[in-house]
Amino acid sequence: MKIFLPVLVMLILCSMCLLTEGQVSTNKKCSNTSQCYKTCEKVVGVAAGKCMNGKCICYP
């Protein structure tokens, strides 16, 4: 039981690192998600992304 907490913390930290590596930030300004599709298709090859804080974020 003593090892459970450290293993759980390590699992959470590793999961956070893997999830943040999966997104590509661009400098393309946007006001809605549909403006990001063409940019994401050029950057990562897939039209999968969204507009966050006025910039396109793409997901490969």
Curated annotation (Swiss-Prot):
- Annotated signal sequence range: 1-22
Entries under SUPFAM superfamilies matching the protein: Scorpion toxin-like (SSF57095)
Q: Which UniProt keywords apply?
A: Disulfide bond, Ion channel impairing toxin, Neurotoxin, Potassium channel impairing toxin, Secreted, Signal, Toxin
A GO molecular function term, named singly, is: toxin activity
A Pfam family matched by this chain, by name? Toxin_2
Q: Name one GO cellular component term.
A: extracellular region
Determine if Secreted is one of this entry's keywords. yes
- InterPro entries of this UniProt entry? Scorpion_toxin-like_sf (IPR036574), Scorpion_toxinS_K_inh (IPR001947)
Q: Where in the cell is it found?
A: Secreted
Q: Disulfide pairs?
A: 30-51, 36-56, 40-58
| Tissue specificity remark | Expressed by the venom gland.
Q: Which family does it belong to?
A: Belongs to the short scorpion toxin superfamily. Potassium channel inhibitor family. Alpha-KTx 15 subfamily.
Q: What is known of its domains?
A: Has the structural arrangement of an alpha-helix connected to a beta-sheet by disulfide bonds (CSalpha/beta).
Cited function: Blocker of A-type voltage-gated potassium channels of cerebellar granular cells. May also inhibit Kv4/KCND when coexpressed with DPP6 or DPP10. The occlusion of the outer entry of the K(+) conducting pore is partially reversible and affects both open and closed channels. It shares the same target in rat brain than BmTX3 (AC Q8I0L5) and AmmTX3 (AC P60208). Has been shown to weakly inhibit TRPV1 channels.
What's this protein's name?
Potassium channel toxin alpha-KTx 15.9
Instruction: Name the species this protein comes from.
Output: Lychas mucronatus
Organism lineage? Eukaryota, Metazoa, Ecdysozoa, Arthropoda, Chelicerata
